[in-house]
Amino acid sequence: MLKKFLISCLFIFLVACGNDSTQQFYGSDISAANLDASFSLTNHHGERATLDSYKNKVIAVFFGFTNCPDICPTSLQELKYIKQELGQAGNNFQVLFISLDPERDTQEKLSLFIPSFDPTFIGLYGSSNEVDAMANQYKVFHQKVEQGDSYTIDHSSGIYLIDRSGKIRIRHPYGSPVEGIIADIQQLLSESI
């Protein structure tokens, strides 16, 4: 009788705990949107780069432009801090900065700007059509806004995390606590491919 009772209690305990495979992230889990992570752009070294160039790494994607006065450099500085906090695990983490300003963000300009945050960060650029296509894939708003003889670019800002199998999984809006971003990256790094 006691044995049946214990088995029943164990069964109830296991059912109550459940086998909930849903993962909890600090950022927004956008995996259900099935966004296309693929790309083919030129990196700041002048080489063509695709998603496969960063195979088996967790990737943080940020869209911005080098003349951005505040949000872009702040986000890149946070990503630098995040990479440092990851320690050795940071070797399996890649930051990609996608330029939304194909007119001004040349290879030369990106090759000076991006490494000033971290030498492992990669700046990517392309033609207007290539950049627009990639921004559309990621649902990133961007618009050129004239300002006297120059212009700025209004854009949505956030960090997209791509898992090691190449799927866009998480989006952290601008201003998200870095501790949450670090925890999400660590969780993605711990997943089997």
Where are these regions (language model features)?
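Conserved helix-turn-beta segment immediately C-terminal to the redox Cys motif
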Residues: 57-58, 74-98
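Sec-dependent signal peptide recognition
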Residues: 2-8
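Thiol-based oxidoreductase modules, predominantly thioredoxin-like and allied folds used
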Residues: 92-105, 120-129
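N-terminal "domain-start" segment that seeds a small globular fold
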Residues: 22-52, 77
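Short active-site neighborhood of thiol/selenol oxidoreductases, capturing the structured segment around
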Residues: 51-73, 79
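Thiol-/selenol-based redox modules, centered on thioredoxin-like
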Residues: 147-193
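Short, internal strand/loop/helix patches
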Residues: 111-156
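C-terminal motif of bacterial Sec signal peptides marking the signal peptidase cleavage site
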Residues: 13-16
